[in-house]
Every structure is written in C-alpha cells, then in structure tokens.
C-alpha cells in the first residue's frame, strides 16, 4: 500500500514535516471512519492521487489498443477491397471501367429459339427475320481486362449462334464493326449498355442490313446528363467511390432530317410526341430516359412512307437503338418479352409486320428464356 511504502522510507525528515504528515493521516482516518467509500490514499506532497488498488489506472489502455486494432483492420479491408478485380460477375479494369463477364450460353434455349424462328418463316414465307446481338465490352475490349481474368470466347459463342440459325434468318454482325471502332467510346464504363455513339453504329448496321435508307445529313448530339451512373456502379469497389468520377455523359444522336413521329404505349394507350423522358435523365435511373423505362409494348408511327412495319423483339439494350429507326420505317412495334406474354405470331397478324428484328445484348440472349415464350405458335 502507499502508506506502507511511505512509512518504510529511511530518509530522515524534519519534525515539522513529520507533524504535517501525522495530521494528514489523522484527518484521513476520521474521514474514513465516517464514510468508507473513499478510494484514494494520500502520499507525500509530490505524489498525486491514484485510483485505489490500481483497478482504474489501466482502463484507458485497452480502449486505445482496441482503436488501433480497428484502424488496422479497416486499413486491411480497404487494401483487400482496392486490390479486388472481380465482383459479382464484373471485372474492374485499370482505367476504372467495369466489364461484364461473358456468360455461358444456354444451349437448349438457343436451339429452341432457332427452331421457332424457322417455324415462323415456314408459316409466313414473306416475313423477313434478322438477329443482331450486341457483344459485351469484354468481348470487344479484352486488353482492358485484368491480367488474371480468364473469360469465355464470346466471339466463338456468337459465331456458333449464327451457324445454327436457319437460312431464312439473317445475321447482323457487330463484332467486326465494333472491333474496327474499339478505340471509340462504344460502351458505358459503369453499365452494359451502348453509349449514344455505340448505339448509332449499331442502328446504322441494322438499317443497312434490312435494306432501308440511312437518313441523310448530320446527326445532332444532345447531352441529357453528365452524371450517368449505371448498374455496375453498385458493384464497384466501395472504398474507391469517394475518389473516382461520379458519372458519365449520357448522350443521344438525332438525325437533322429525322422523320416526324408519335408513339403509343401498348398498355395505357397514352401517346407522346417524343421517345425520350427528359425528367428521367436527371434521376437515379437515368437510362429510363429511353421510352420512360422498360415498356411491354410500344407503337411508333412515322411520316416515312414505305409500307414497312418493323417488329423489334429485344431487351433493354435495344432501348437506345430503336429510336434511331424512326426515319427508316413507316411503323415500328417494340416489344420487351420479359414484360408481356404476347407472341410474335399474334403481333405479325395484328400489325401486318414485314420485318422482325431480334435485338439483344449478347449475354441476355445467351440465357434469357422469355424469348421462347414470345416465339411460341
């Protein structure tokens, strides 16, 4: 105890000092007899009060050590997070972009889809069918993938799909076209969809393949948003969201001599003089700027008189491409099979369809079976 240690000191002290110490001891004894809850003992003038028994003296040390451990653990997780290159099927590239892993094809689905297309051709021999699949960015830009990435050869998968199509169905190739323009911004860095520029290339390829005229004159570029953040941003490395760009440019290209048109929502029957929803461009779901979101069925009627009615069966990849068809077809019917059970055969009869375009992102076409329901007869 502190008292015992002090009493054992052999160094002589003056009488006055000794008396003062005795008086302090007496005062302490009196206070202790009245209230025995005191936890402090008095030593010499130079020694400060200390917690009794030392039970509280080290209480701050464990908290300090805990803070150090938490900081070290957080830094370790952050380092692991930063070094991660693959997350939820998405590769993070050195330039900050996100590339989706090519999916394994559903062989049965692909075979059944090709068979249904052939059956449709036999039922409607004058109906022209086309398939255009947009390859993933990883397929076109493999050099941007991390060195450790091992992905499927999607070019080979697409070639296999093409080889299994019936002769009555025409394939529209985008792999070579996009490879020739791989140095241009064809894809969003934070989403699987094509940019306005990439959509322009795809639309022109489809229009030419379907024997229609591309609008004359220049295309006008419109910036709808400069803070677009796609679905891949949700899977990017969280610790880097604070340090990297918060968005991309969302642009559309419109021909200067674009034909006049109006669209009708197949369910609500509401019509509009625009294919775009300007309010959506500034929302968290900016890609809904096209048609106001994913619609089951949309009718587009134009002033282009050529007796051609195009039926587009597709996924959301088609949303940014279809608007560029308005100057090349008199009527366009755009259907998302995931939103409606309507069949191609019924649509062909109802709208007197002359051409059918199956327009999908390659990954979606590889695995999405809703198309099979639409192709049923």
Report the location of each language-model feature.
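Extracellular glycan-modifying ectodomains
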Residues: 2-6, 10-377
């Amino acid at each position: 105890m502190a008292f015992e240690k002090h009493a054992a000191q052999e160094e002589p002290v003056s009488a006055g000092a000794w008396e003062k110490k005795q008086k302090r001891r007496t005062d302490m004894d009196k206070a202790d007899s009245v209230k025995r809850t005191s936890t402090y003992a008095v030593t010499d003038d130079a020694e400060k009060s200390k917690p009794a028994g030392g039970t509280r003296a080290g209480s701050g040390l464990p908290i300090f050590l805990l803070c150090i451990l938490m900081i070290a653990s957080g830094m370790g997780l952050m380092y692991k997070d930063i070094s991660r290159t693959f997350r939820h099927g998405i590769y993070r590239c050195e330039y900050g972009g996100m590339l989706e892993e090519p999916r394994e094809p559903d062989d049965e689905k692909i075979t059944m889809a090709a068979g249904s297309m052939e059956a449709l051709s036999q039922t409607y021999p004058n109906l022209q069918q086309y398939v255009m699949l947009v390859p993933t960015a990883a397929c076109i830009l493999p050099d941007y993938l991390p060195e450790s990435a091992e992905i499927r050869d999607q070019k080979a998968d697409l070639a296999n799909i093409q080889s299994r199509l019936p002769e009555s169905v025409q394939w529209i190739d985008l792999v070579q076209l996009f490879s020739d323009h791989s140095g241009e911004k064809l894809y969003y860095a934070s989403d699987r969809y094509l940019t306005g520029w990439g959509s322009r290339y795809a639309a022109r390829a489809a229009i030419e393949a379907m024997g229609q005229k591309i609008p004359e004159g220049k295309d006008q570029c419109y910036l709808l948003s400069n803070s677009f953040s796609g679905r891949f941003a949700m899977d990017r490395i969280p610790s880097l969201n604070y340090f990297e760009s918060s968005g991309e440019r969302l642009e559309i290209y419109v021909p200067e001599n674009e034909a006049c048109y109006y669209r009708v929502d197949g369910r609500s029957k509401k019509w509009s003089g625009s294919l775009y929803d300007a309010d959506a461009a500034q929302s968290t779901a900016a890609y809904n700027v096209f048609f106001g979101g994913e619609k089951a069925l949309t009718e587009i009627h134009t002033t282009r008189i050529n007796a051609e009615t195009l039926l587009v069966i597709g996924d959301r990849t088609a949303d940014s491409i279809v608007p560029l068809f308005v100057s090349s077809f008199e009527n366009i019917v755009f259907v998302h099979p995931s939103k409606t059970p309507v069949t191609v055969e019924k649509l062909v009869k109802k709208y007197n369809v002359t051409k059918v375009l199956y327009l999908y992102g390659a990954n979606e076409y590889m695995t999405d079976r809703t198309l099979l329901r639409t192709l049923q007869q």
